[in-house]
């Protein structure tokens, strides 16, 4: 049964015929065959090689011939004979084993391995479809073939189409896109090709061979000029390095040169050893600028005081507790002692008018904190039987402070004597009280004004200045347009004012409420409130606080002699000092030195202070 398959022959349509390698690249060429075939087609060459062997028209003759084209050092007869028996055995196995696909597949794999393996093995010597020459070699031949040893890109394309058979039918735009792109790529890739600018306008550059003989193989791609690979920057870095070395050598001889002081600084670029800062040595480093953080502080905003702790900063603006206030104002326990409280009670008995001012009393610093952040104290150098000043009704304004001459105050009076002084420092409230007032105008006046702008580097406690008869009061600054002309027949008794403390560069507005009275009488006139004059410029403030004074119409100037009247018995022993100053020099020297500052005030009605209604003037200062 093993002999039967040799007689049976398979149909020629089913024999494993070799397929031309048209679908693969590169195509088989006649020069690859080591046989004696001279034809370009594999099938005819196979037939010509098989016929002389006497192999009579066997069905597998063409397959053996194709195999012979790719065989080396093997006899064509052996190959043809072996291949003739293979189909016979395959055909015999088909009807017997009932597994025809397996043996033919194995045979086809063997034949395919011979067909596919051999060409790849032999094609290793052929780099491209047109031969062993690369694109770079073809470009080199094209340039060398020209008379001037230079070609434009279009001339290189033309030479390729004319000289290389592979590109003869690929000169049109559709089929030339690929290889033309490869040529451009190789021209840019290899350093052996250099581009020379064409002299003519509108013409492409010349491509020439590098006379220095650049690398023909793959070299690092030439990228666009940058600081890393541009020769100009490399040269500049070299010059900078040399210059730096020369500067350093020169610095040793002359240590006071400008370059030496830059390089000696720790933050100077010249002090760094990194090469990235080489170029900086020729420039003026920004660290030498007086605006640098290394140099002195140039900010127009004044720095915060170093001696102010966190608790001292806002203690006067927002007193957290009585204990905190006592720590902020060390003399608070002294000025609010029981003696002052008794004086306050005695003085309250004098207030017989229905519109009298009721001042809340506190017996100890611990109870001085009211619902609103207010506090009361009287200067320790006074022995007045006047009410302890209740520092309410005015919110603190904010500004920077520095030790200045004087803080002015103005007192609005209507031909009535004023007695005592009441400075009010407080948070919210006067605006609402003025707006809701239902009493006739001109009875009581509560007119808040802008704060006096002061600058002080140290906190100064308020000091009272006693102004008696024949005392001339300086008043300067501007006031609202509805200021009244004050009569010189009125006089002011101690006007207590407090200079503000430096709190984060913020100024505190001052307001003075004066309680007028008639000497020798047991009743007091309705309360008149004196207010502070707004300062348009920062004023220098000495240890003395503001002065309560009678204002002239223009807001500043020398005041006339005040009305002379006998002081109360408790004030006869007080020290009275005549205050006089040159207003013109103060205005020129002090007021004009500063810059105007804008302030906004939000006055709100406090919970405890002035139970009686406060009346406004007919020309209310409150804006709608």
UniProtKB/Swiss-Prot annotation:
GO terms for cellular component: cytoplasm; nucleus. Phosphorylation by NLK promotes nuclear export and inhibits the transcriptional activity. In response to growth factors, phosphorylation on Thr-24, Ser-226 and Ser-292 by PKB/AKT1 promotes nuclear export and inactivation of transactivational activity. Phosphorylation on Thr-24 is required for binding 14-3-3 proteins. Phosphorylation of Ser-226 decreases DNA-binding activity and promotes the phosphorylation of Thr-24 and Ser-289, permitting phosphorylation of Ser-292 and Ser-295, probably by CDK1, leading to nuclear exclusion and loss of function. Gene3D superfamilies: Winged helix-like DNA-binding domain superfamily/Winged helix DNA-binding domain. The modification Omega-N-methylarginine is found at residues 221, 223. GO terms for biological process: apoptotic process; autophagy; cell differentiation; cellular response to hyperoxia; cellular response to insulin stimulus; cellular response to nitric oxide; cellular response to oxidative stress; cellular response to starvation. Keywords: Acetylation, Activator, Apoptosis, Autophagy, Cytoplasm, Differentiation, DNA-binding, Methylation, Nucleus, Phosphoprotein, Transcription, Transcription regulation, Ubl conjugation. A motif (Nuclear localization signal) lies at residues 221-223. Disulfide bonds: none annotated. The modification Phosphoserine is found at residues 182, 188, 204-205, 219, 226, 257, 268, 289, 292, 295, 299. The record marks 128, 135, 195 as: DNA-binding. Residues 181-188, 204-207 are annotated as: DNA-binding. It comes from the Eukaryota. Residues 279-296 have a biased composition (Polar residues). The modification Phosphothreonine is found at residues 24, 303. Residues 37-62, 105-119 have a biased composition (Low complexity). The modification N6-acetyllysine is found at residues 215, 218, 232, 235, 244, 393. SMART domains: FH (SM00339). Residues 333-428 are annotated as: Required for interaction with RUNX2. InterPro entries: FH_FOXO1 (IPR047408), Fork_head_dom (IPR001766), FOXO-TAD (IPR032067), FOXO_KIX-bd (IPR032068), TF_fork_head_CS_2 (IPR030456), WH-like_DNA-bd_sf (IPR036388), WH_DNA-bd_sf (IPR036390). GO terms for molecular function: DNA-binding transcription activator activity, RNA polymerase II-specific; DNA-binding transcription factor activity; DNA-binding transcription factor activity, RNA polymerase II-specific; protein phosphatase 2A binding; RNA polymerase II cis-regulatory region sequence-specific DNA binding; sequence-specific DNA binding. Interacts with LRPPRC. Interacts with RUNX2; the interaction inhibits RUNX2 transcriptional activity and mediates the IGF1/insulin-dependent BGLAP expression in osteoblasts Interacts with PPP2R1A; the interaction regulates the dephosphorylation of FOXO1 at Thr-24 and Ser-263 leading to its nuclear import. Interacts with NLK. Interacts with SIRT1; the interaction results in the deacetylation of FOXO1 leading to activation of FOXO1-mediated transcription of genes involved in DNA repair and stress resistance. Binds to CDK1. Transcription factor that is the main target of insulin signaling and regulates metabolic homeostasis in response to oxidative stress. Binds to the insulin response element (IRE) with consensus sequence 5'-TT[G/A]TTTTG-3' and the related Daf-16 family binding element (DBE) with consensus sequence 5'-TT[G/A]TTTAC-3'. Activity suppressed by insulin. Main regulator of redox balance and osteoblast numbers and controls bone mass. Orchestrates the endocrine function of the skeleton in regulating glucose metabolism. This is Forkhead box protein O1. It comes from Bos taurus (Bovine).
């Amino acid at each position: 049964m093993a002999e039967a398959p040799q007689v049976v022959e398979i149909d020629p349509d089913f024999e494993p015929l070799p397929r031309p390698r048209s679908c693969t690249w590169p195509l088989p060429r006649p020069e690859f065959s080591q046989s004696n075939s001279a034809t370009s087609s594999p099938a005819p060459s196979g037939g010509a090689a098989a016929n002389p062997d006497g192999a009579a028209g066997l069905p597998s003759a063409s397959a053996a011939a194709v195999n012979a084209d790719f065989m080396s050092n093997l006899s064509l007869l052996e190959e043809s004979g072996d291949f003739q028996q293979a189909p016979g055995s395959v055909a015999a196995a088909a009807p017997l084993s009932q597994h025809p696909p397996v043996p033919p597949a194995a045979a086809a794999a063997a034949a395919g391995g011979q067909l596919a393996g051999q060409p790849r093995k032999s094609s290793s010597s052929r780099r491209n479809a047109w031969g062993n020459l690369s694109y770079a070699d073809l470009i080199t031949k094209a340039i060398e073939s020209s008379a001037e040893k230079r070609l434009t890109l279009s001339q290189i394309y033309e030479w390729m189409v004319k000289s290389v058979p592979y590109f003869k039918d690929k000169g049109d735009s559709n089929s030339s896109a690929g290889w033309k792109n490869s040529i451009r790529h190789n021209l840019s890739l290899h350093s052996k090709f250099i581009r020379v600018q064409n002299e003519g306008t509108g013409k492409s550059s010349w491509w020439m061979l590098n006379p220095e003989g650049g690398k023909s193989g793959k070299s690092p791609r030439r990228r666009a000029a940058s600081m890393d690979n541009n020769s100009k920057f490399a040269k500049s870095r070299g010059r900078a390095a040399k210059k730096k070395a020369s500067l350093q050598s020169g610095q040793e001889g002359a240590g006071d040169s400008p370059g030496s002081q830059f390089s000696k600084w720790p933050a100077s670029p010249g002090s760094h050893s990194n090469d990235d800062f080489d170029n900086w040595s020729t420039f003026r480093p920004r660290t030498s600028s007086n605006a640098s953080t290394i140099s002195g502080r140039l900010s127009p905003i004044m720095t915060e005081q170093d001696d102010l702790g966190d608790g001292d900063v806002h203690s006067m603006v927002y007193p957290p507790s009585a204990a905190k206030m006592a720590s902020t104002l060390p003399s608070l326990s002294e000025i609010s002692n029981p003696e002052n409280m008794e004086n306050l009670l005695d003085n309250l008995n004098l207030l017989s008018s229905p519109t009298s001012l009721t001042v809340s009393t506190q017996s100890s610093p611990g109870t001085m904190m009211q619902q609103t952040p207010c506090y009361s104290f009287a200067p320790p150098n006074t022995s007045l039987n006047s009410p302890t000043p209740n520092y309410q009704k005015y919110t603190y304004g904010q500004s920077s402070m520095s030790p200045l001459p004087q803080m002015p105050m103005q007192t609005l009076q209507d031909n009535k004597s004023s007695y005592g002084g009441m400075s009010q420092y407080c948070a919210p409230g006067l605006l609402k009280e003025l707006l809701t007032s239902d009493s006739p105008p001109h009875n009581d006046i509560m007119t808040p004004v802008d704060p006096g702008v002061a600058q002080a580097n140290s906190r100064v406690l308020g000091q009272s200045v006693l102004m008696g008869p024949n005392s001339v009061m300086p008043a300067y600054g501007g006031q609202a347009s509805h200021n009244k002309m004050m009569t010189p027949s009125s006089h002011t008794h101690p006007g207590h004012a407090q200079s503000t403390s430096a709190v984060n560069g913020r100024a505190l507005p001052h307001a003075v409420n004066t309680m007028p009275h008639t000497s020798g009488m047991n009743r007091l006139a309705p309360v008149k409130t004196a207010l502070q004059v707004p300062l348009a410029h920062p004023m220098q403030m000495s240890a003395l606080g503001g002065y309560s004074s009678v204002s002239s119409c223009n807001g500043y100037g020398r005041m006339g002699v005040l009305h002379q009247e006998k002081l109360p018995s408790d004030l006869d022993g007080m020290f009275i000092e005549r205050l006089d100053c040159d207003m013109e020099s103060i205005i020129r020297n002090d007021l004009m030195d500063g810059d105007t500052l804008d302030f906004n005030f939000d006055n709100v009605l406090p919970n405890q202070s002035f139970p009686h209604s406060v009346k406004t003037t007919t020309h209310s200062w409150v804006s709608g």
